[in-house]
Amino acid sequence: MNLDSLRIKPAEPEEAEFLANVILDADRDRLSEDPDWDEAAWLANLRAAAEREVAGKVEHSITSVIVLDGERIGRLRVILPGDEIHVAGIQIHPSYQGKGIGSKVLGSVIEEAETADLPVTLEVGKDNPDAKRLYERLGFQVAQDRKVRELMRLSCPSGSTR
């Protein structure tokens, strides 16, 4: 595995199935704890959402595929409303988690935010302490405590929070 080969490329319509599956694979352990969880229904909803995203039907949304050594291994979705960069989703296939890929992907988002002098926001589930530790290590701080999630923010380099 060579992290120097890591690429983030725009998702193509034919990759909607991959996008849905990588989200499911990355989140399956947490989702399956819910006794009412229906994997087939969840996957169908993820697929429909991915199809809308890659077709450009979600305003201000950019969905990308994370590629390492020529293999698709994850998904990154950002929303660009103009006053911030919101990471709406980052999923890395479980066999690639814990190898610094998420840090590198988020690092590229942070670099773009620094160039544009914009803050970066994201949400993390309270049931996902590993992701929260990663975000805190990168400098994100909890900006708002929500029922089952927390909104985290990394301020712009100029210090403004816009």
Where are these regions (language model features)?
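Conserved beta-strand in the GNAT
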Residues: 65, 71-79, 86, 91
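Conserved N-terminal entry element of GNAT/NAT acetyltransferase domains
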Residues: 1-17, 156-162
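Conserved acetyl-CoA-binding loop-helix of GNAT-fold acetyltransferases
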Residues: 92, 98-111, 133-137
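Conserved GNAT-fold acetyl-CoA-binding loop/helix
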Residues: 27-52
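Conserved GNAT acetyl-CoA-binding A-motif
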Residues: 113-123
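A short beta-loop-alpha structural element at the N-terminal edge
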Residues: 7-21, 30-32, 143
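Conserved beta-strand-loop-alpha-helix junction that forms the acyl-donor binding cleft
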Residues: 94-97, 122-132, 148-157
